Amino acid sequence: MLPMRPELLKGHLDALLLAVLEPGPQHGYAVIESLRSGSDGALHLPTGTVYPALHRLERAGLIASDWQTVGGRRRRAYHLTQAGHITLSEHRALWDQFSTAVTALLKRRTWPATA
């Protein structure tokens, strides 16, 4: 698999984080691991990318958090709000349209071989 270029993530991080939180609450490190494992390792994002995005989504009211104690350690667990569920549905609809259009265009082209 080719390494994921960071610029490809622009505009999609919010949707990815909302999708990872859809099944239920997760603490920050679990979110990072869910992104990595759910993408077969393609999305291995640093904490400096994920935590600020989680805080931004929380300020926007798309996710909320609660403190939990796990293994004797306090961790903040994030979960989707109703607005987050709605926004995720909207992101999915837009992604379906976008990816269909891009796939249609890219499959028509013959790309030059790269060395």
Question: Where do the PLM segments sit?
Answer:
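Short beta-strand/turn micro-motifs at beta-sheet edges
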Residues: 3-7, 65-67
